[in-house]
Curated annotation (Swiss-Prot):
Belongs to the type IA topoisomerase family. Residues 614-639 have a biased composition (Gly residues). Residues 609-715 are annotated as: Disordered. It comes from Caenorhabditis elegans. Residues 3-147 form the Toprim domain. This is DNA topoisomerase 3. Disulfide bonds: none annotated. Its EC number is 5.6.2.1. Pfam families: Topoisom_bac, Toprim, Zn_ribbon_GRF.
Amino acid sequence: MKRALFVAEKNDVAKGVAAILSNGTANRREGRSKFNKIYTLNTELFGQQTAISVTSVSGHMMNFQFHENMSNWQTASMVELFRAPVRHVVTPEMKLIEQTLREQAQRHDILVVWTDCDREGEAIGAEIVKVCRDSNRRLDIFRARFSEITKAAITRAARNLIRLDEKTVAAVDCRSELDLRIGSAFTRLQTLHLRNRFRDLLGQNDTSQVISYGSCQFPTLGFVTDRYKMIENFVSEPFWKLIVEHTRESHKVEFLWDRNRLFDRDTVDILHDECKETKEAHVEKVAKKPKSKWRPQALDTVELEKLGISKLRMSAKQTMQVAEKLYSKGFISYPRTETNKFPAGLNLTPLVQQQTQSNIWGDFANEVLQNGVNPRNGRKSDEAHPPIHPLKFTEKHQLQGDDWKVYELVVRHFLACVSQDAQGEETMVNLTVGTEKFHASGLRIRDMGYLKVYVYEKWGNRLLPTYTEGERFTDFELKIGDGKTQAPDFLTEADLISLMDKYGIGTDATHAEHIEKIKTREYIGVRPDGKLIPSFLGLALVDGYDDMGFAMSKPDLRANLEIGLKEICDGRRQKQEVLDEQIGKYRAIFVESERKIGVLSQSLQRYLDKNNQAGGGPGGPGGGGGPPRGPGGGGGGGPTGPPAPPKPPAKPRGRPPRKSISPAVKNGHDDPENDTIVTLSEVFGSMSNPKPARKPRAPRKSAAPKEQEEEEEVFCQCPEPMRAVTKVVQKEGPNKGKKFYTCSLPYTSSEKCNFFKWA
């Protein structure tokens, strides 16, 4: 009888696979690690009875490390970290699992990898293969592809085994090696320099604060600091607007100005006076049209994380940890997916049928079955996993706390997705007073549709009284409203994930990990309301590299790497090609950064000085570390961190220009004939320069009359422009006597345009 070893990524998955393939009769025994059991069973594999042992690892077993001669921070050359040899070794905490795999590999003929079907899962599978093959070179290696722990999915995977995707493994190895080299070099550079300059703050021994760098975490930090600075530098600007209020049928209706708002009070006063002269409002148009509120698209990882943050008040990391637990226990499908459209061949009706048992949403599930299962699909597919959806029914008392909250979210989202849009009727009333146009809208809900189950969104009636097209009325009140422009809000974790997804920083599977890392390193803090604020250390790091002329906190460099990794996965580029290219870019920046490193300490000193004067700022430390699975990135943060940020200190405006003339630096080859010469101009020349945040407009000054040597020919904005007429402000006030241009048509004309310009 053949003997096969199945190895899953987690013990819960191993347990589920064994239970399904044995119909619940598998035997359990202990492995070397108490957390990773061994399950034994007999079943058919490749058309013949096979004795199978099922065990597991706990995420990544191995990582890239430098040799011992590069481990001393004081003596090893930092720039050599870009070309020094590295090795792929089993980490100390995984030694017991390694021992189990070696022992089991010797006793089996076939190895089947049952890790998660994503990039990291493929790389973990390659680590399992390496350990097992070192023990038994004769092993025949296969890979099972599945997206859920169900009988159908596991049985299908066991009958359709494939080989590991070596291109995907190469992409992960490329990223891991780059993270080690880049993170180690910049972490040592900035930590040693800042420790030396700020001994009291950071200490000087091996347990002191590590100022770590990661090529994904730094752009993530950059998004937070950019928003913080945008808010701090925001200049509020006053504005004015016209409002028409009218009461009918006991409803007070506010008609909004079609111009929205203007930033010049005098202009608004003039337009207000013109409207007052008319003394009546004319209903130009009353239109009714169907209005729909679309049900949500099928659920992918990014949307699950964002919903977990905004609706469940959980962090992205917590949401994904719970989702993975639910997946391992067979409650939901694989939660790390970029797909938001269900494949045509997937029968969703049985999944809806299961949920009819619920005393919470069972009636809605029955309604979905009566109307027909009709998923709203997006356009994305990773060609590996379906959207996240429930696999089996459970009740609230069977899941506790966050487990239930995430399960409920997945179920409600799924039922909403496969149901019907909410339907209503919108009424739009267009009003004219003098030369100015206004509008009001109402909404009457006719069918709540998906909103009956999707409690995370609201859509309410907004009733309007009856208006008749062409009618006129005088019992209205014309007002001038005022306000000030508001700064954007601080980012939430959901906002940050959206930006990371938009600019290609990390993947859907790693966004939460990167955010947790900059929290742990205390580069950002989280306010009680969930808003993210940089610490002054985070601000100083970003400013320091900006002042050197390197946009390290911008997404370009890392996004470019993510593109390279995808090209490796697709077979369009080789691992070594991408590795050499990225090492060349970052090494060029490192050489210049090392030369200008004093700028970094100057940046931190400015914030320290400002903090001492102002007594700190609104931020606070974060908490929680990232899970072992996924990318590294240059070391971990220390247990404590500097205070939160003050307002950014005053410093010369603008950034020093990037220097295109710099010493040529070589890549990491030992053979000088094969070295690629890379200059800083080449590093940044291939990507668009990041645009600085737009400076807010200064408040506009009141317009003044123009002195003209000859009469200006001015035309209005009618479809067929006519020469504008000149009028004079008659109202008492600072603008009395000023001339302005307006449309030549009479105020009573419906064709008169809204043109206005000071003369």
